[in-house]
């Protein structure tokens, strides 16, 4: 019998996380695929003819959540400042330049994702 790299419990939890971030897959060049006994794989930076430039396997739902949250956060923080000097700052520094309302919206979105994932 082939070795399994993810428990059934973690498979179900990772599926919830992958589904919760469905909107991210429409915003950026990223997706999560169920890789069976190997867990879930985050694929990023697609190029036709080349495939995905980055792949990372996950067998823990919290690690998958943190990875997808990081990508969502970076997209939301960086996209509005592309082409400006602020784009040279790191993500947390850019976050600090946002209005308090926008900062709260982003933090609320993290709480929303946590609730969807039930973690």
Language-model features: where?
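Short intrinsically disordered terminal tails
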Residues: 1-5, 111-119
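Negatively charged, low-complexity tracts enriched in Asp/Glu with abundant Ser/Thr
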Residues: 2-28
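Short, exposed beta-strand/loop patches in secreted or surface proteins that constitute
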Residues: 21-23, 30-34, 56
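Acidic, low-complexity, intrinsically disordered interaction modules
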Residues: 34-108
């Amino acid at each position: 019998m082939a070795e399994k790299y993810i428990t059934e419990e973690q498979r179900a939890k990772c599926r919830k996380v992958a589904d919760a971030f469905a909107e991210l897959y429409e915003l950026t060049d990223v997706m999560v695929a169920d890789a069976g006994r190997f867990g879930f794989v985050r694929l990023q930076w697609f190029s036709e003819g080349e495939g995905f430039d980055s792949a990372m396997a996950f067998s823990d739902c919290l690690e998958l959540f943190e990875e997808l949250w990081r990508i969502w956060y970076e997209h939301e923080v960086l996209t509005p400042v592309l082409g400006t000097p602020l784009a040279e700052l790191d993500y947390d520094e850019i976050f600090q330049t946002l209005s308090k309302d926008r900062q709260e919206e982003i933090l609320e979105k993290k709480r929303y994702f946590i609730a969807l994932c039930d973690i």
